[in-house]
Amino acid sequence: MEWQNVKRDECQKRKRRNSFQLGIRRLATRLATRLATRLTARLAIRLSTSLSTRVIVPTVVLGLFASSLPNTSLGQGTEEQLPQAQVEFFESRIRPVLIEHCYECHSADSKIVQANLLVDTKSGLLQGGDSGPSLVPNQPDQSLLLKALLYEDSQMPPKGKLSDEIINDFRKWIAEGAIDPRTATANRPEKPWIDPTAAATHWAFQPLKPLQGLSQVYSNDLNSPTSTQSNNHPLVASPTNRIDYFVEATLHKKGMLPAAQADAMVLLRRLSFDLTGLPPTLEETERYLNDPPELRYELLVDRLLSSPQYGARWARHWLDSVRYANSNGADENHEMPNAWRYRDWVVDALNEDLSFDAFVRQQIAGDLLPPPDDEIQRNRLITATGFWVLGPKMLAEQDKAKMQIDIVDEQIDTFSRTMLGVTLSCARCHDHKFDPFTQKDYFALAGVLMSTRTMADQAFVSNWMERELPTQARHEQRAAHQAAIDEATQARHLLLMKTHQDLLDQGKIPQLPENNKEPIKDGPYTEEMKKQIEESQKHLESLQKGMPAFDRAMAVEEAKEKVDMPVHLRGNHLKPSDERVPRGVPKILVKAVEFPSIPPDQSGRMQLADWLTNPQHPLLARVMVNRIWMWHFGQPLVSTPSNFGLKGQSPSHPELLDDLAIRWIEQGWSLKWLHREIVTSEAYRRTSRDARYEESDPENRWLWKQNERRLEMEPIRDSLLACSSRLDARLGPPLKGEGPRRSIYLNINRAALDDLFSVFDYVDPASHIEQRPVTTVPSQALFFLNNPIVSTASETLGEQIAKSSQDDRESIDQAFRKVLGRAPSSREIDRSLSFLQLCVDALAEQSQATPATGVPVDKQQYRTAALSAFVHGLFSTREFIWIE
């Protein structure tokens, strides 16, 4: 009884202690909000003219600055800029359905326009017909078009209700504003699409243009009559990086001067996040500052490019482009347990600086390349082809022919936007409305992919292809295991044979027949014999089930039947034309590089890889240089990075784009060379704190300064873990449990994304991601106030700082350096000291007001809680998640 009383007292003390600590944490959170409010007014917080640069601090702070935000109401501006992703959604998911199911009765070409409704134009849909407007943007439930598709009111199309998948596409389209790029009016049909040769002069389809005599070009730009001389801006001294020739010559033409270079600590943080996705450690900072000033920056670049964390950072960018995920999504959201092998292949390839042409070739046709002697390398070539398999698939689609062509359509969409920078999938149902791609072009490439096996079977719920990755070590394991199975089988057989003598000895059978077999089968067994036989059987079955399996990877292989595809009328696989299109690529693109002939017994993937990676190809190098530039500057040279077509934007610096692409190819397609060339330019190293030309060039199109950029979700989470010394930076296969690994290793479930993904603008992983948007929403501030990741990081780092020093000034300095990557100013130190004292006093006051708990109060606990609240406030500042 006495023992039970002691245990009860200990339990009550523990509850009081936990309650006290919880109270401290809650008060610390409230104080952190107050701290963030104070710090926000001081810590490098600037509101620019862009909505995307709002302060990400607690909601109360957002309220203080609300009056400073620009008017962002809809309808302002001289030209409507449609979201590219929504335009592509309309072109690939909405327009084809309208063409196939509605145009016959509701277009300008209809003999009789039924119900006075035209759906072949944007204005026709909005205007509607006899029953009124067909669409109410953002209100699907009020839109007659959706009601008709649902068969609630009128029933359209009359030949049969469309699938739930298509109807859901229309619901989504209307809910997101019914974006429609068509410009024709209801009484003026769109101009028929032109012949491909009419667009032959488009800049993106021309060969790369090498420049001769760069210094002369620079001089010509200086003396160009188009140069703006009104401000008498002198051209800066001859640059050492070729990139700066082009940028500074353009600035001179515009009458603009470049911004100054950013200071050393800003460059350290910028470069560390750009190349590794992680903040610099205190040790890295000290080494950087101790390097010779004239070599400091270049040495830092080399160290970061050599870090294995470089591969983890830049693989995430590529995975966005190729719609990487760990589950199928769509109708059957099955886990893709081996998708991670492709992800790890990308990380390893980037860390090894695999040439980009080889990087692309292996993904397109790695299984068809000459197999290397090294078995690991052979398996990597197979794994690389997972690129084709990663997309979402309608696994339960019972029309397997439709399922297959839809898979091919998704593959074409991802391939064309990622590798070619064009929207070829828009030509499935009709000739491309804007670009020189015909339906024949589409089905020429579709034939290559239809001749490639992506699906393992055509079952009720189909399965994607997975291929074995055999190794000699695993072969030996399997051989040894098979030997054990054979031995167990033989032992069991002998055990059964030995029962003959046992039965005779027991007198159960008076004699054996001449054949010595049949009576033994029918004779009785002793319990001991039964037990031995059962154990031997269990052992054998266990061995058989435990046969070591070969690793498997999502991958493709050549299909048994190679096919040339017929053009499908309006994209409908049930309406093939009589003419078959030879396997190949768009004809407009073979002007610069001829496409190799495809033998009848080959799919054409090998020829596709050879053609695409030819140094003379006009698109691949341009597209990738533009993307790398975008990920370093926050904006690309071509502002539509996945659409180099006629509706895409022209490059701001066309000579720079071509020159950099040509030199990259000459350097062996080395991505690390390309990174080094970009980040060592003056253009990259400029400060973002310059507002001289905000009015004349608000988007910084002419690169007169560096752009301020917000971190994506992954480096935000990784920084919280790294700052609190909790990050598990190991690369490689999945580990048991999620743990504090880098965010690239988080599970991406297409049907159930973690809330953390959506808070910071991670977009739909079911399709190619051109560029992540940057939005400002209240949930981001709430994330920093309430999310356990932030509170745990704050408490952990606060405890670490409290233990490392008893001097508050040293603790404040350490917190600033760990969280923000810089030393605090003297005024920031004074304000922070005041906050810490305020926090300690408040905690002590709360402790006195709390009924006695019987637990001795540790004053150091107040200081630790105050430092945790202080760190929480630093995490909540804008400076933490923005790269200057």
Show the residue positions of the predicted features:
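Long, intrinsically disordered low-complexity tandem-repeat segments
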Residues: 27-51
